[in-house]
């Protein structure tokens, strides 16, 4: 049975279906993730609103047992800076894919919807897309059932010390308790400090981000380890991000010719 619903929606991806139809995966604020069928997509009035990472207020027919349909739309938001930059687009696509992977279909999650939308908005506003992605990755871990402690020592619970991370205890150790895990990570102490900040930061309060390239590289490598150990998903969009270093070198060489 189809039911009418008006809700904010964000297109996660689309794919071809038959000759000129499309299946469009949309994360809606009120009805969760749904798959929509769009007939004759290239000629449809819906064409502007079914592109990936496009947001709009959608009038929909929701089907709990199959494909849903878009009847109309208004207030379309396109993220121009994201769409014009290969690198930002890659990271934006990755956070959208992470949100998709963390949530079952048809399950409303307005908080996650708002978090994803705000992440894309800040990327589009020019904030550091790599660090925004790191923050998103850390805060969304709980939706994969992962709880990590970067705030206080797993043994004495003291704070504000040069911590190191222990996979054995899923948390940090202070210098007095480094010996509790001979296989601790030997991290730069700045990383646990930053990850503790990332867990707590609210994007509504975030105006600027500035980290040195070497710290960003260390964060990227360590968060990859966390995801390999605790989450175990391998997204195509993440593999593309991992290849961006090569793309960057190619583009830089072309610009210098």
From Swiss-Prot:
Source organism superkingdom: Bacteria
Residues spanning the signal sequence: none
UniProt keyword annotations, A-Z: DNA damage, DNA recombination, DNA repair
One example of a Gene Ontology biological process annotation: DNA recombination
Protein function: Involved in DNA repair and RecF pathway recombination.
Family under the similarity heading: Belongs to the RecO family.
Name of the protein in its database record: DNA repair protein RecO
The species this protein was found in: Streptococcus sanguinis (strain SK36)
Lineage, top ranks: Bacteria, Bacillati, Bacillota, Bacilli, Lactobacillales
């Amino acid at each position: 049975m189809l039911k009418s619903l008006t809700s904010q929606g964000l297109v996660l991806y689309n794919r071809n279906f038959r000759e000129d139809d499309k299946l469009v995966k949309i994360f809606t604020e009120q009805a969760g993730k749904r798959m929509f069928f769009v007939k004759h997509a290239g000629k449809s009035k819906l064409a502007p609103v079914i592109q990936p990472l496009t947001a709009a207020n959608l009038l929909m027919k929701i089907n709990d047992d199959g494909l849903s349909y878009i009847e109309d739309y208004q207030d379309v938001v396109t993220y121009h800076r994201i769409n014009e930059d290969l690198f930002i687009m890659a990271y934006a696509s990755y956070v959208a894919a992470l949100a998709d992977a963390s949530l079952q279909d048809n399950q409303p999650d307005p908080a996650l919807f708002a978090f994803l939308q705000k992440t894309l908005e800040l990327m589009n506003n020019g904030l550091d897309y790599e660090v925004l992605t790191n923050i998103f990755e850390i805060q969304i871990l709980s939706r994969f059932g992962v709880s990590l402690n970067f705030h206080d020592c797993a043994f004495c619970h003291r704070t504000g010390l040069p911590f190191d991370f222990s996979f054995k205890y899923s948390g940090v150790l202070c210098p007095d308790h480094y010996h509790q895990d001979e296989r601790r990570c030997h991290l730069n102490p700045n990383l646990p400090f930053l990850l503790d900040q990332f867990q707590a930061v609210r994007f509504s309060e975030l105006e600027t981000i500035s980290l040195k390239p070497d710290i960003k590289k260390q964060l990227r490598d360590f968060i990859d380890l966390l995801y390999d150990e605790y989450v175990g998903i391998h997204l195509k969009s993440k593999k593309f991000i991992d290849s961006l270093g090569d793309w960057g070198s190619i583009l830089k060489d072309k610009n210098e010719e």
